[in-house]
Regions:
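Short glycine-enriched nucleophile-adjacent loop
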Residues: 174-185, 191
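Alpha/beta-hydrolase fold active-site neighborhood
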Residues: 239-365
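Catalytic-loop region of hydrolases
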Residues: 2-7, 25-119, 425-430, 434-477
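A catalytic-pocket lid/entrance helix-loop region that shapes and gates access to the active site
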Residues: 187-249
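N-terminal cap/lid subdomain of alpha/beta-hydrolase-fold enzymes
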Residues: 64, 70-147, 358-380, 387-390, ...
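Alpha/beta-hydrolase fold nucleophile elbow
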Residues: 161-171
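Active-site-adjacent alpha-helix of alpha/beta-hydrolase-fold enzymes
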Residues: 379, 385-423
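Conserved acidic catalytic loop of the alpha/beta-hydrolase fold
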Residues: 148-163
Length: 477
């Protein structure tokens, strides 16, 4: 469902590859050698070792943890859930990172981990391979079961990492961190959720229509809509190229039904995907309606991605689309400028991206429950959004006395789906950074006195703290 849905790993939240180690805060270093951290972790029942990747300043382990398929009935069997451990020191705070998708097995650091100069545990979401039960009972893929995975891993690791813990994630990972907090509110000392959509009522999506009527400037909106329409006017010519590309590259369309249906989805993604990953300043790259078909084809592929709705492009994200069609909900929006050019009403929905042998039925109420909890009962929650990110059109809402409960929500002006605390205006950036430090229990005296003194405890590392968003095709958060 549009490249945008993709955003829900897309973000996944700007994690990169570890380079040189950062300076430690205080005397703590990665040298926890007595006993060896790997040995300590592997003594935990259910843990198994996959690999270790050496790098300066940390220990980095890829591990599996045995989890119940059904936390309500553990006797029904288990599966191996993959996670990674970026170990700095046991006397530092720990950040529990989730992308909501597959886990990146290269060393990486989320923004809160850099802020607190701590350890990071990154967990793969259940049913994303290889963390999928065999055979897969898809009815056991829901937000409570996934939150229970996190809770159980946290309980296993807490005796080793006994300082404060924070949960974080971007997009679907931000949703995941929020759901974890809703079901297990006392596990974490704080939560930082980036660009996390909140689809409270699945059939009420007028917020997206309002968003696309006002995002950016009028000239850019008009040009994007015109090019999107032109892509359908030239459908037959471009689909012919698309089919040849698919044949040459071994791509198939069994799930969506045909190359023509896949192409309609790709085009419907176009405007959403542009704003998800680009800025107002990128509007100059949008071609005119008189552009050559070669240029138009290239633009569509760069923004939406022709592989997105092939069987091969969809397969990895089947668990996401299953959840979108059974519990999370998925955005819809009107496209009056495409009137008369769309051939497949209703095709732009999660059910059409999941193999038909997997049953799906939408269950109302889950998102409303989380929304109510955030507004009424949550504590120490920080939501960070980008003003120009379509996924921010339906954000989590804060209730009464939010600041007294240390709940905050900030929007970065002009920000997209890669927005971070560092992108906020100065006073909000300082406030957010100070709160994260306090929640982690590592706020220096100067920060306790004045939020304006707050800054990350670890220096920026260009490989470890990569700024760019990991992009994915299709409408995913």
């Amino acid at each position: 469902m549009r490249k945008a849905l993709r955003a829900l790993l897309a973000l996944t939240m700007s994690i990169g590859t570890v380079g040189a180690g950062s300076a430690a805060a205080g005397a703590a270093t990665a040298a926890d050698t007595a006993p060896d951290i790997k040995e300590r972790i592997l003594k935990i029942p259910g843990m198994s070792f996959v690999e270790e990747k050496p790098y300066e300043g940390y220990r980095y382990l890829v591990l599996n943890y045995k989890q119940p398929i059904d936390h309500k009935n553990p006797a029904k069997g288990t599966f191996e859930q993959r996670f990674t451990l970026l170990h700095k020191a046991t006397d530092r705070p720990t950040v529990f990172f989730t992308s909501g998708y597959n886990v990146n097995t290269n060393p990486s650091r989320s923004e809160p981990t850099r802020i607190v100069d701590g350890n990071q545990v990154s967990m793969e979401y259940r049913y994303f391979t290889p963390s999928r039960p065999k055979p897969a009972d898809w009815s056991k893929l829901d937000i409570w079961q996934a939150a229970s995975d996190q809770h159980r891993l946290f309980q296993a690791l807490k005796p080793v990492y006994n300082k404060n813990w924070l949960a974080t994630g971007g997009s679907k990972g931000g949703m995941t961190a929020t759901y974890f907090r809703r079901f297990y509110p006392n596990d974490m000392n704080g939560t930082v959720a980036y660009v996390a959509p909140n689809d409270v009522v699945n059939n009420e999506d007028s917020a997206y229509d309002r968003f696309f009527a006002s995002v950016g400037d009028q000239a850019c909106r008009t040009q994007l809509n015109s090019v999107q329409r032109e892509a359908l006017v030239r459908r037959d010519e471009i689909v012919g190229r698309y089919q040849k590309w698919a044949k040459d590259n071994g791509k198939t369309f069994k799930v969506v039904g045909s190359a023509d249906k896949a192409y309609e989805n790709v085009v419907l993604d176009l405007v959403w995907a542009f704003w998800q990953y680009h800025l107002q300043s990128d509007c100059k790259t949008v071609p005119s309606t008189k552009a050559s078909t070669d240029d138009l084809y290239k633009f569509i592929d760069e923004i939406s991605g022709f592989e997105a709705y092939t069987d091969q492009g969809l397969e990895q994200y089947t668990p996401y689309y299953y959840q979108a069609g059974t519990e999370l909900g998925a955005p819809t929006f009107k496209s009056p400028h495409l009137k008369g050019l769309l051939r497949y009403p209703g095709i732009y929905s999660p059910r059409n991206y999941v193999p038909r042998d997997i049953p799906m039925k939408f269950r109302n109420g889950s998102m409303a429950d989380v929304d109510r909890w955030v507004r009424e009962d949550s504590k120490r929650m920080l939501f960070v959004y980008g003003q120009n990110d379509p996924w921010s059109a339906e954000p989590f809402r804060l209730g009464r006395n939010a600041e007294a409960r240390h709940d905050y929500r900030f929007f970065a002006p002009g920000g997209n789906h890669g927005t971070k605390i560092a992108d906020l205006v100065a006073d909000e950036r300082a406030k957010a950074t100070a709160e994260v430090l306090r929640w982690a229990g590592v706020a220096p005296a100067a920060v306790q006195k004045d939020d304006r003194n707050a800054k990350p405890l670890a220096p920026f590392n260009s490989k470890l703290d990569r700024k760019d968003v990991e992009r994915n095709t299709m409408l995913r958060p």
